[in-house]
Curated annotation (Swiss-Prot):
UniProt keyword list: Adaptive immunity, Calcium, Cell membrane, Disulfide bond, Glycoprotein, Immunity, Innate immunity, Lectin, Membrane, Metal-binding, Signal-anchor, Transmembrane, Transmembrane helix
Lineage: Eukaryota, Metazoa, Chordata, Craniata, Vertebrata
Membrane topology, Extracellular segments: 44-209
Knockout-associated phenotype: Deficient mice are healthy, fertile, with normal lymphoid cells, but show reduced survival after intravenous Candida albicans infection. In deficient mice fungal burden is higher in kidneys of mutant and in response to yeast antigen inflammatory cytokines and Th17 cells are reduced.
C-type lectin domain location: 86-203
Source organism: Mus musculus
Disulfide bonds: C64-C78, C79-C90, C107-C202, C176-C194
Official protein name in the record: C-type lectin domain family 6 member A
Length: 209
């Protein structure tokens, strides 16, 4: 009888140890999970601050607009002063003519790149800002002259999103692209020599706060 009670006592003690180990393990896992969430949340929340810090080296001030239709969706989309806002990007129309490579370098020095056009709506917005007597470099080029066009930010070149003028592109030696107004087809893309001088359009992603 005594042995049976001792055996039962050992069983209860062993069971308690198992439960204690399980509870401790769960607490440790929960703590690790919470810590991970906090680190991830902090990392995500820090992104606007880091981007703002980066832009501050190029621009002295930003203009921000309230975006979203509901209170819970409200956020601020910011662009540097004098840049145009559309969708998730900011655009700056250059007032100086330069070579394609120099134009890209000028954009990079402002935390941007030559414009990448992804939709017809974006093309239409951009052309509304342009002077019809000028042409503007885009961030599109064919470095090897083999007809493989590529965007400066490595966005895949889509055959469904292209706005060439009729009969363009027409020369393999013309390896860069400008957007220009030609009657009667209006605004469209034209392949040009990269060492010819044109105005340009810079693009950067908006900052969201």
């Amino acid at each position: 009888m005594v042995q049976e009670r001792q055996s039962q006592g050992k069983g209860v003690c062993w069971t308690l140890r198992l439960w204690s180990a399980a509870v401790i393990s769960m607490l440790l896992l929960s703590t690790c999970f919470i810590a991970s969430c906090v680190v991830t949340y902090q990392f995500i929340m820090d992104q606007p601050s880091r981007r703002l810090y980066e832009l501050h080296t190029y621009h002295s001030s930003l203009t921000c607009f309230s975006e979203g239709t509901m209170v819970s969706e409200k956020m601020w989309g910011c662009c540097p002063n004098h840049w145009k806002s559309f969708g998730s990007s900011c655009y700056l129309i250059s007032t100086k003519e330069n070579f394609w490579s120099t134009s890209e370098q000028n954009c990079v020095q402002m935390g941007a790149h030559l414009v990448v056009i992804n939709t017809e709506a974006e093309q239409n917005f951009i052309t509304q800002q342009l002077n019809e007597s000028l042409s503007y470099f885009l961030g599109l080029s064919d470095p090897q002259g083999n007809g493989k066009w590529q965007w400066i930010d490595d966005t895949p070149f889509s055959q469904n999103v292209r706005f060439w003028h009729p009969h363009e592109p027409n020369l393999p030696e013309e390896r860069c692209v400008s957007i220009v107004y030609w009657n009667p087809s209006k605004w469209g893309w034209n392949d040009v020599f990269c060492d010819s001088k044109h105005n340009s359009i810079c693009e950067m992603k908006k900052i969201y706060l």
